[in-house]
Design a protein with these regions (language model features):
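FNR/FR-type flavoprotein reductase catalytic core
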Residues: 71-152
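Ferredoxin-reductase
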Residues: 1-80
Length: 152
């Protein structure tokens, strides 16, 4: 079982969870995703890794409750657990394999909105950790739906 350390509503109908998943946290890179399953009856749901902390062994996911399984997920609290939490899956962002010095010469701009901001955050964080400047343009239908603004 994969224990939920934190669960909160970031904005109207957008939720964030920090999940204990040490193996996933050790191996993930920006652009990858996990597949979660809350319980035996739940569907397997692919979700972008919004953040990871290798030292703490945690993964952060952000989602909107659209289907039955994500609607159940939004009711999970800190201390609850996911039945399955598989990852990291998918290809990392292209720049993870590029030469750092070459990346420093480029102008990198991300455009994101609403829950689609979640995949941008780990990429910006990775670039910043490697001394690479990048910009982000974040929008949403209303100011209340802008997420991760402080983090970025």
């Amino acid at each position: 079982m994969y224990k939920i350390q934190e669960a909160e509503m970031l904005a109207n109908n957008i939720y964030r969870m920090v999940v204990e998943a040490p193996r996933v946290a050790q191996h993930c890179l920006p652009g990858q995703f996990v597949i979660v399953k809350a319980d035996e009856e739940g569907e397997r749901i692919p979700l972008t890794i919004c953040d990871y902390d290798r030292e703490a062994g945690t993964i952060t996911i952000v989602f909107m409750p659209i289907g039955e399984s994500t609607k159940k997920m939004k009711d999970l609290k800190a201390g609850d657990a996911f039945m399955d939490f598989v990852g990291p899956l998918g290809q990392p962002s292209e720049f993870c394999s590029e030469d750092i010095e070459e990346l420093k010469k480029k102008r990198i701009v991300f455009v994101a909105g609403g829950v689609g901001t979640a995949p941008v955050y780990p990429q910006l964080k990775w670039l910043h950790e490697h001394g690479i400047t990048a910009d982000a343009i974040v929008g949403a239908k209303t100011k209340d739906l802008v997420i991760l603004e402080k983090e970025m």
